[in-house]
């Protein structure tokens, strides 16, 4: 049976999951004739959850009466991230998706049936007007439930679906769902989804609205950098990245000699081995994680980072040039994520195996001491970045939910 992370009166907030045998509470504020119910299906990784939360915020900004329900699984980051953002979360059985068609895909119907039933119960409980899916473990059951599968004893009810694909190479759940979705949106062209409209990746409002120039002095003071510093920002995701840590920390002496300040988020499980700072060296600020990314972006002139969809979206949205180091596993999607920015001139790609202290020192010093080239890369990154992706997805969802004939019962 599905679980729920319930909310207090007023339609938002979260408490502990209810017992599995408890009755489902009403989700969001009380339904009314003029309030729309939107179910956001995106769980598992931050790359699925964060765009969903950005769209939730955009929906509420467009229509404060909208009722938001996030659909997730017990194993995903949504169990922490969704309640933190103040939205209601319903949990269903996780259905891991195979990367490629084959035997696992052939056995998928037996695995997914329970999750589809649970998803359908959620859609009925909240009287859903539209499902917005972001891929991942929870998306396919939501798409199938919204399609109106004839699961007795209830009548079929089709709910419109909007799909957003954040990666350059669409995952299996979104490839399946796109065949019958009402609208298909993607981060980049050529994602593998037909009819896809390119909107970028939804990012948090604090990032989308960031004016780096206005916030720069405050941001640099926050981290202890001089106003006129040349600042390199390094991060490898929520857990850091060992290869980035080694390469950049190994280049610390050369970076200091070039007058480069460093803000380095190395990950809570990692430890940096740094040389003792010499008198007169620019600051090298090493932290386990950054909880104010807007300040980090505002302080920086250049970034070294991975190339996950959310990372590329945020870095390009704020107009930061970057050295992208794709994760050297998977099917190469991280490199594909970075290519639109790189091809536009807003960054470069360096293979993980090629990232050495010598390369870091040479490339970073070369860029940060060449104002004309850095300015050109900054402008290119800003041109290709998408600041209003969350708003575009939210507007598409509301349009589909209110469209004539969008919702039918047979």
From Swiss-Prot:
Residues reported in the UniProt entry to bind UDP-N-acetyl-alpha-D-glucosamine: 45-47, 167, 204, 238, 334
Cellular location(s): Cell membrane
Membrane topology: Peripheral membrane protein
GO cellular component: plasma membrane
SUPFAM superfamilies: UDP-Glycosyltransferase/glycogen phosphorylase
Principal location listed in the UniProt entry: membrane
Annotated region (Disordered), positions in chain: 1-34
GO molecular function, one term: UDP-N-acetyl-D-glucosamine:N-acetylmuramoyl-L-alanyl-D-glutamyl-meso-2,6-diaminopimelyl-D-alanyl-D-alanine-diphosphoundecaprenol 4-beta-N-acetylglucosaminlytransferase activity
Superkingdom, taxonomy of origin: Bacteria
InterPro entries per record: GlcNAc_MurG, Glyco_trans_28_C, GlycoTrans_28_N
A UniProt-annotated Pfam family: Glyco_tran_28_C
Keyword set, alphabetical order: Cell cycle, Cell division, Cell membrane, Cell shape, Cell wall biogenesis/degradation, Glycosyltransferase, Membrane, Peptidoglycan synthesis, Transferase
Intrachain disulfide bonds: none
Family membership: Belongs to the glycosyltransferase 28 family. MurG subfamily.
Function: Cell wall formation. Catalyzes the transfer of a GlcNAc subunit on undecaprenyl-pyrophosphoryl-MurNAc-pentapeptide (lipid intermediate I) to form undecaprenyl-pyrophosphoryl-MurNAc-(pentapeptide)GlcNAc (lipid intermediate II).
NCBIfam families found in the cross-reference section: murG
Name recorded for this polypeptide: UDP-N-acetylglucosamine--N-acetylmuramyl-(pentapeptide) pyrophosphoryl-undecaprenol N-acetylglucosamine transferase
Organism of provenance: Mycobacterium bovis (strain ATCC BAA-935 / AF2122/97)
